[in-house]
Regions:
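Gly/Ala-rich beta-loop-alpha elbow adjacent to hydrolase catalytic centers
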Residues: 72-77, 81
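Residues that line or immediately flank small-molecule/substrate-binding pockets and catalytic motifs
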Residues: 42, 73, 100
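Alpha-helical structural signal in soluble globular domains
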Residues: 2, 6, 83-88
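Structural motif
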Residues: 68-70, 95
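Active-site loop signature of alpha/beta-hydrolase-fold enzymes
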Residues: 43, 79, 104
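Helical cap/lid subdomain of alpha/beta-hydrolase-fold lipid enzymes
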Residues: 51-54, 58, 62-63, 85-234
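Active-site catalytic motif of lipid deacylating hydrolases and related acyltransferases
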Residues: 1-67
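Short, conserved active-site loop motifs that form the nucleotide-linked donor/cofactor pocket
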Residues: 33-35, 69, 175, 207-208
Length: 234
């Protein structure tokens, strides 16, 4: 709503389909400034989500071959977005904005795995709350299905795909990292501040503009205002 109010019209949504990803046009599909939402299988491993995102970007490039393409991702979505930049930026993304994303992983993933591996009768505590916020879902069956993405989001250095991603060369585009800032410390109750800061990724050190926002992990209207400001200056 905040993007819409500031002139960024809803261009549509891309959803999984038999053929790959399907674009469902919105009222702003032909507007000069438009945004698109992408529906991804949030419980899937990061590489699988990145595959679907790549298909979505291919669809957008088919419809809009010459327009500037800016990616914005919240939480794990910001990490997924980095995957599609690899290999010489095949979709010609000009800018990446991540919001509260666990670029160096999060200990909450280990807590989620503890819930899965313990096979409890119920899911109290931070493990299930982590899943609700990071990938979505509210019960044990969903948590169990999300084991792959939890392994991917273990703290960097675990030998997982995130560790691999952070060693890959990234294209020379504009990078923004929105880092949550609570009264006690940088970060939030899901992802620590140092993990949200893209400058801590070895191949991106010193190349990222970091913006701090006094907020919890979930998206809020102020994020839309912040995004619109970045987009207007792009």
């Amino acid at each position: 709503n905040e993007l819409q109010a500031r002139g960024w019209h809803r261009g549509g949504v891309l959803v999984p389909a038999v053929q790959g990803m399907q674009l469902i046009p919105g009222p702003g599909a032909d507007a000069v400034h438009k945004s698109f939402a992408v529906s991804l299988p949030a419980e899937a491993p990061l590489a699988v989500q990145a595959h679907y995102l790549a298909l979505a970007l291919g669809v957008l490039r088919h419809h809009y071959p010459e327009e500037k393409l800016i990616l914005a991702g919240h939480s794990a979505g910001g990490v997924v977005a980095r995957f599609v930049l690899l290999g010489n930026n095949p979709y010609q993304v000009s800018q990446l904005i991540t919001i509260a994303s666990p670029h160096l992983g999060t200990g909450r993933a280990a807590q989620g795995l503890d819930v899965v591996d313990a096979k409890p009768f119920f899911c109290p505590g931070p493990g299930i709350e982590f899943l609700k916020h990071l990938v979505g879902g509210a019960d044990y069956d969903y948590l169990e299905d999300s084991r792959g993405v939890l392994v991917d989001l273990l703290p960097a250095g675990s030998g997982n795909v995130l560790s691999w991603l952070n060693q890959q060369p990234h294209p020379a585009i504009a990078y923004y990292a929105v880092v949550r800032n609570t009264p006690l410390a940088a970060g939030d109750n899901i992802v620590p501040g140092f993990s949200q800061d893209l400058n801590n990724v070895p191949t991106l050190q010193g190349k990222v503009t970091v913006l701090y926002t006094p907020s919890g992990h979930v998206l809020n209207p102020q994020d839309g205002v912040l995004l619109a400001g970045i987009l207007d200056n792009s």
